[in-house]
């Protein structure tokens, strides 16, 4: 099994190398990761400037590693298209320092990187662990869970077209009661804008805080808040065609109104 590993925390993130340590027991691992932190970049792809790549010294001997001046999505696209010459069997992104739950997957660079594998028909995993004021203490718990999921994909126990989002408490596995398959929760957020002045110009900080979390026991948020590992199959949630219909008269009316508006210019 050939595994491309990326992340959004940067190529020297402890979470990435904890993951590599366990995944190399499953197959051949190649690292293609950003040369610096790229959190909350979502599905950003660099189109207006060249991507520069440097083969770099791995923190684990024997691992082929590349640092990319680009986003997590850039890394996976470039890795699959140019840097890895043999077919890749699995894309894994993480271990992210910070959970990716509910609607937050839409802005996650970790999930965005895994998405690039899935869009190219490669099973893909995003793995995250919570962060408070200190670094996570149990990165190996997340790495071991990911390695086991990778084995099951390899063996055919988990479908080959999977796009999985895994979140795990920062605990030893012996203290985690259960792993649950969960749907994504819907979270309510508010963005606040803080203003400052550097002596010459105004500047702004965007701050995001969660107003409410799901109390539904079936969702990923409830499960992680209650000490469970969560696995969510994102391909079923993000790409399912929503129910949305318009009558022919309504579609014609929209087009006619738009044409009328344009004629007035």
Curated annotation (Swiss-Prot):
Pfam families to which the protein is assigned, alphabetical: SurE
Enzyme class: hydrolase
Domain of life: Bacteria
Cofactor(s) listed: a divalent metal cation
E.C. numbers: 3.1.3.5
Subcellular location: Cytoplasm
PANTHER family the UniProt entry points to: 5'-NUCLEOTIDASE SURE, PHOSPHATASE, PUTATIVE (AFU_ORTHOLOGUE AFUA_4G01070)-RELATED
Role description: Nucleotidase that shows phosphatase activity on nucleoside 5'-monophosphates.
Protein name: 5'-nucleotidase SurE
Originating organism: Dehalococcoides mccartyi (strain CBDB1)
């Amino acid at each position: 099994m050939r595994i491309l590993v990326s992340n959004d925390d940067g190529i020297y993130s402890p979470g990435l190398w904890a993951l590599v340590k366990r995944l190399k027991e499953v197959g051949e691992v190649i690292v293609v990761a950003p040369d610096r932190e790229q959190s909350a970049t979502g599905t950003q792809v660099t189109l207006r400037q060249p991507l520069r790549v440097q083969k770099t010294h791995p923190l684990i001997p024997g691992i082929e590693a590349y640092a990319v001046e680009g986003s997590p999505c850039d890394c996976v696209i470039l890795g699959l298209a140019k840097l890895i010459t043999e077919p890749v069997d699995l894309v894994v992104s993480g271990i992210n320092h910070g959970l990716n739950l509910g609607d937050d997957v839409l802005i996650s660079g970790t999930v965005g990187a895994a998405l690039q594998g899935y869009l190219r028909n490669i099973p893909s995993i995003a793995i995250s662990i919570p962060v408070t004021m200190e670094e996570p203490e149990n990165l190996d718990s997340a790495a071991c869970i990911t390695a086991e999921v990778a084995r099951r994909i390899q063996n055919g126990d988990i479908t080959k077209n999977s796009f999985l989002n895994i979140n795990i408490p920062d605990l030893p596995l012996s203290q985690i009661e259960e792993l649950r398959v969960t749907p994504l929760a819907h979270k309510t957020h508010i963005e606040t804008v803080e203003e400052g002045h550097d002596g010459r110009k105004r500047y702004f900080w965007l701050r995001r805080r969660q107003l409410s979390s799901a109390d539904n026991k079936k969702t990923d948020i409830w499960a992680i808040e209650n000490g469970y590992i969560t696995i969510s199959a994102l391909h079923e949630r993000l790409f399912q065609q929503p129910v949305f219909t318009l009558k022919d008269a309504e579609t014609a009316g929209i087009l006619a109104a738009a044409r009328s508006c344009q004629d007035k210019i």
